[in-house]
Regions:
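N-terminal beta1-alpha1 cap of cysteine-dependent amidohydrolase-like domains
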Residues: 1-291, 299-326
C-alpha cells in the first residue's frame, strides 16, 4: 500500500502510473490529501478506500464503518472556527510548543465543544516582568500555567497568576501551576512576602509548598515521584465539583511537592479554598477562589485524560469562563 501525501487531488492517470512503476494495484495507491484539520484525515482516508484495502490484504471481513460520530466532530471543529478566544500559556519551555502538546490539544478539545477556536499566546515566563506584564497579557481572556520543574521563570509565572487573580481573568494552574497559584496568593493575599516553595528556596519562613512526607528520604531520580492515577474527593459547592458533576474523581499525577498543611488553614482563612483532597484529607489536590470567575489549580494533570470528543471538565470549564470574558 502506498499512501501519497498531496496538496491537490491525485489525477487518475498519475495514480495508474504510480501503481505501474511501484508494482501495486491501483486501489493500493491511496491519496492523503491535505486537510484543514488533522481530525479530518481519517474521513479522507476512508473515502479513498484505505480500510477496505487493508482488510482485503489481511484477509479480514470488511464491514461498513460507522463514521457518523467522527463526522459530527469534524463538523463541530469547522463550526468553531467562526469564534476565537485567546488563552495565554505561560511556561518555561514555550520555544518548543510540543513540550505542551497535551495541554494545547486539551484546549483545542474544550474550545471545539464550546463552539470556539482557542488561539494560544505562548508566553515565556522567564521574560515576563512587572514592566511588560500588562502589555503581554492584556489581550488574553484566560491564563494557563502548566507543569514544570526548576526555578527558572518561576517569578514570571507568579506575576501571571497575580495578574489573573487581581484582574478577574480565568486562570488554570496545572501541577506546578497550582503551586504557583498558592505561592502568589500567600504572598499578596496572606501578606507573606517571602512565601515560596521549598523546591526553590531553602531560606523562606513560609514554605507554602513543601516536599511530601514520603519523599523526604528519596534521593534516587526517575520513577520515584508520586506517579499515576489517584483518587480525589471534591468539596461540595466548588467550581471543581460543578465542572466534574461528581464527588470522587481519579486523575493522573507526577510530583514530589504538595501544598503544605502547616499553612493550609491560614491561607484558607483569607480566601483560597481547598476544593479537592485525597480521600484521607491530607493531600491538597485542588484549590480555587470562590469569588473569582475561574481561578482553579489542580495538582494532577487533566490534559492526559482529555479526548477530542470528550474534553476534560476542567479545560471545558476554563474555556467557558474565558469566553464569558469577551
Amino acid at each position: 500500500i502506498l499512501v501519497c501525501r498531496t496538496d491537490s487531488p491525485l489525477p487518475e492517470d498519475m495514480r495508474k502510473k504510480i501503481a505501474l512503476f511501484c508494482n501495486v494495484s491501483e486501489d493500493c495507491v491511496i491519496p492523503n490529501l491535505t486537510a484543514s484539520t488533522l481530525y479530518e484525515v481519517p474521513l479522507l482516508l476512508e473515502r479513498e478506500g484505505l480500510c477496505r484495502v487493508v482488510c482485503r490484504m489481511l484477509g479480514l471481513g470488511a464491514g461498513e464503518p460507522d463514521m457518523r460520530h467522527w463526522q459530527e466532530l469534524v463538523t463541530q471543529i469547522h463550526a468553531a472556527e467562526q469564534r476565537h478566544v485567546t488563552i495565554a500559556l505561560v511556561g518555561k519551555y514555550t520555544e518548543l510548543h510540543d513540550a505542551y502538546l497535551s495541554v494545547a490539544e486539551s484546549l483545542f478539545h474544550a474550545g471545539t465543544a464550546c463552539g470556539a477556536q482557542v488561539d494560544i499566546q505562548w508566553v515565556d515566563s522567564q521574560h515576563l516582568t512587572a514592566e511588560n506584564l500588562t502589555e503581554t497579557l492584556c489581550g488574553c481572556s484566560g491564563i494557563l500555567v502548566p507543569g514544570g520543574f526548576g526555578d527558572r521563570g518561576i517569578e514570571g509565572m507568579i506575576l501571571a497568576a497575580q495578574y489573573a487573580r487581581e484582574k478577574g481573568i480565568p486562570y488554570l494552574g496545572i501541577c506546578l501551576g497550582m503551586q504557583i497559584a498558592v505561592i502568589e496568593f500567600a504572598r499578596h493575599a496572606a501578606g507573606w512576602a517571602d512565601a515560596h516553595s521549598a523546591e526553590f528556596s531553602a531560606v523562606t519562613a513560609h514554605p507554602v509548598i513543601d516536599l511530601m512526607p514520603d519523599q523526604g528520604g528519596v534521593t534516587a531520580k526517575g520513577g520515584t515521584m508520586r506517579l499515576g492515577k489517584y483518587p480525589c474527593v471534591l468539596a461540595e459547592g466548588t467550581k471543581a465539583r460543578e465542572a466534574y458533576g461528581q464527588r470522587e474523581i481519579w486523575e493522573r499525577h507526577r510530583h514530589r511537592y504538595e501544598c503544605s498543611n502547616v499553612f493550609r488553614r491560614e491561607v484558607e482563612a483569607v480566601g483560597l479554598r481547598v476544593a479537592g483532597t485525597s480521600p484521607d484529607g491530607r493531600l491538597v489536590e485542588m484549590v480555587e477562589i470562590a469569588d473569582h470567575p475561574w481561578f482553579v489549580g489542580c495538582q494532577f494533570h487533566p490534559e492526559f485524560k482529555s479526548r477530542p470528543d470528550r474534553p476534560h471538565p476542567l479545560f471545558r470549564g476554563f474555556v467557558v469562563a474565558a469566553l464569558a470574558q469577551q
